[in-house]
Curated annotation (Swiss-Prot):
Subcellular location: Mitochondrion matrix
Residues given in the record as NADP(+) binding sites: 157, 183-186, 206-208, 279-282, 304-306, 365
Cellular component, GO, one term: mitochondrial matrix
EC number of this enzyme: 1.3.1.104
Entry's Gene Ontology BP terms: fatty acid biosynthetic process; fatty acid metabolic process
Chain segments annotated as transmembrane: none
The entry's keywords: Fatty acid biosynthesis, Fatty acid metabolism, Lipid biosynthesis, Lipid metabolism, Mitochondrion, NADP, Oxidoreductase, Transit peptide
UniProt cross-references to InterPro entries, sorted A to Z: ADH-like_C (IPR013149), GroES-like_sf (IPR011032), Mito_Enoyl-ACP_Reductase (IPR051034), NAD(P)-bd_dom_sf (IPR036291), PKS_ER (IPR020843)
Species: Schizosaccharomyces pombe (strain 972 / ATCC 24843) (Fission yeast)
Identification of the protein by name: Enoyl-[acyl-carrier-protein] reductase, mitochondrial
Annotated function: Catalyzes the NADPH-dependent reduction of trans-2-enoyl thioesters in mitochondrial fatty acid synthesis (fatty acid synthesis type II). Fatty acid chain elongation in mitochondria uses acyl carrier protein (ACP) as an acyl group carrier, but the enzyme accepts both ACP and CoA thioesters as substrates in vitro. Required for respiration and the maintenance of the mitochondrial compartment.
Subunit structure: Homodimer.
Top-rank taxon: Eukaryota
Keyword Transit peptide among UniProt keywords: yes
Length: 372
């Protein structure tokens, strides 16, 4: 019997009581298949400074997986809130909730039926219900979103894209940037926001059998130029093409979520004094920066972590959330290439766990949508 099946049996009750909350939890770091388990627990009436919420949708982000593996810098507390037998953390950081009950302290801020998103990290979003400090919730207007997918993914990917375009370097209308991972959720949001702001872009994606279809999709969203990583590596052609594309303009910004050779190659086509912001490392390779780019082009390289940025600029980040909400409302932003995975909140624990594990292993962006 596999570890996770054993874990389900060990921490589950023998009969599931309708009305109990469920969560995906772990008490040690490691492979999600081996350490995750489903737990059922009671949620008491919320206290005066709490809001009782039920989860409508919980995205699965790469950082969530890294957190479970124990390799992510931000780590949740292990408590006995959902499992009395062993201190545990609830997985997930991003989530869309509906208010069910409101403690006295927040009755003027929240009301039953209202939508909100988690405003803090490490709260545990892969669950059906919780009591949460009202200060950790950000109310959102449900009418602003075409679907539940946009609202559920509001706080991470589009806000990261906004920060990368608006808070790394000063870009003016007509300026260029180059980005890898352009078909990632952040990349797609960056393309759409850049179109809105009037920025032009060179977008790098991995080659694939249906590459022309992908190129057309990204261009329809606002991408100026789309190339493959193989085309990027063709220096002779790139040295000819880039000047033709930018027509005397400047590539002031590089946006990198891949690192390795791809990011290093992108840097060669950035203008003097430009900045590359790295917010991911999907290649799991270091970034080999030629000394000449530092000395003769004065390029700047730094990391960007939206969690840290949010903690250092909480008021500004709240404004960004509402700006992004407006972008969804007016059609500037739309969510593409996402899959909603339905899960009944009263499903048995094995089904509950298996649904999350299958979503983790699958390809593309997955959002668990709880059916009430």
């Amino acid at each position: 019997m596999s570890f996770f099946k054993t874990a389900v049996r060990r921490f589950s009750s023998t009969s599931i009581t309708r009305g109990m909350a469920k969560a995906i939890a772990y008490s040690e770091y490691g492979n999600p298949k081996e350490v995750l388990r489903a737990v059922s627990y009671n949620v008491p009436k919320c206290s005066k400074n709490q809001v009782n919420v039920r989860f409508l949708a919980s995205p699965i982000n790469p950082s969530d997986i890294n957190q479970i593996q124990g390799v992510y810098p931000s780590k949740p507390p292990f408590t006995n809130d959902v499992c009395s037998s062993k201190p545990s953390a609830v997985a997930g950081n991003e989530g869309l909730v509906e208010v069910v009950d409101v403690g006295d302290q927040f009755k003027g801020t929240f009301s039953p039926g209202q939508w909100a998103i988690l405003g803090s990290v490490n709260l545990g979003s892969w669950r059906t219900e919780m009591n949460i400090d009202g200060r950790s919730l950000v109310p959102v207007d449900k009418s602003a979103f075409p679907s539940i997918a946009e609202a559920a993914t509001l706080s991470v990917n589009p806000c990261t894209a906004y920060c990368l375009l608006q808070h790394v370097v000063q870009l003016n209308k007509g300026d260029w940037f180059i980005q890898d991972g352009a078909n990632s959720m952040v990349g797609i949001a960056t393309i759409q926001l850049a179109k809105h702001f009037g920025y032009k872009s060179i977008n790098v994606v991995r080659n694939r059998p249906d590459i022309e279809k992908l190129k057309e999709q990204l261009k329809s969203l606002g991408a100026t130029i789309v190339i493959t990583d193989e085309e990027l590596m063709d220096r002779k052609t790139m040295k000819q093409k880039v000047p033709e594309w930018i027509q005397g303009g400047e590539v002031k910004l590089g946006i990198d979520c891949v690192s390795g050779r791809v990011a290093a190659e992108m840097a060669k086509y950035m203008s003097k004094g430009a900045t590359m912001a790295t917010f991911g490392g999907m290649s799991r390779q270091p970034l080999p920066v030629p000394v000449s780019l530092l000395i003769f082009k004065n390029l700047k390289f730094h990391g960007f972590w939206v969690t840290k940025w949010k903690s250092e600029h909480p008021e500004e980040f709240l404004k960004i959330i509402h700006k992004v909400e407006d972008f969804y409302r007016n059609g500037t932003l739309k969510t593409v290439n996402t899959e909603l995975v339905s899960l009944k909140e009263d499903a048995d624990e094995k089904t509950f766990l298996d649904t999350f594990l299958n979503a983790i292993e699958g390809h593309g962006k997955k959002i668990i949508k709880f059916e009430h």
